[in-house]
Amino acid sequence: MAFVTTAEVCDANQELIRSGQLRALQPIFQIYGRRQIFSGPVVTVKVFEDNGLIRQFIEEKGNGRVLVVDGGGSQRCAILGGNPVVQAQNNGWAGIVVNGCIRDVDEINGCDIGVRALASHPIKASKKGLGEQRVPVNIAGTRICDGEWLYADTDGILVSQIELSV
């Protein structure tokens, strides 16, 4: 899809919004990284205060995908830091959305990747590799499934069951 704002996507797709095929995430995310606008097919990971699975995905080629991490909204530690974000950038991920905290904000803000997270926190997560991958996640009341499409800009984040064109 050529760049069209999320607001324009919503305006042009009212029927998809009414049917639930196009959903907007609640405006709870902070914007990090140099790429403020990003989109791509979704890969989901569900973890809690552990980033082992996140790191496994980031080591793969991203091919323009968006990693959606449901960290349970925890604000007790950061489940993503600068090194993995640099690796995600280098491996071709379009963006990462974290329902939780990140750290190394200055380093992340220098990366050419889009990152959304609830906040920053200096304490790092464990690395046990606990969690689930490629499962439906629920972030602030919005269900997101592996393989859906995510569109993010400075107005917000949209999730669609199908790839959109306006």
UniProtKB/Swiss-Prot annotation:
One of its GO terms (molecular function) is 4-hydroxy-4-methyl-2-oxoglutarate aldolase activity. It holds the Pfam family RraA-like. Its EC number is 4.1.3.17, 4.1.1.112. InterPro entries: RraA (IPR010203), RraA/RraA-like (IPR005493), RraA/RraA-like_sf (IPR036704). Divalent metal cation. GO terms for biological process: regulation of RNA metabolic process. Keywords: Acetylation, Lyase, Metal-binding. Gene3D superfamilies: Ribonuclease E inhibitor RraA/RraA-like (3.50.30.40). The keyword DNA repair does not apply. It is an enzyme of class 4 (lyase). GO terms for cellular component: plastid. SUPFAM superfamilies: RraA-like (SSF89562). Substrate binds at residues 81-84, 103. Catalyzes the aldol cleavage of 4-hydroxy-4-methyl-2-oxoglutarate (HMG) into 2 molecules of pyruvate. Also contains a secondary oxaloacetate (OAA) decarboxylase activity due to the common pyruvate enolate transition state formed following C-C bond cleavage in the retro-aldol and decarboxylation reactions. Homotrimer. This is Putative 4-hydroxy-4-methyl-2-oxoglutarate aldolase 2. It comes from Arabidopsis thaliana. The lineage of its organism: Eukaryota, Viridiplantae, Streptophyta, Embryophyta, Tracheophyta.
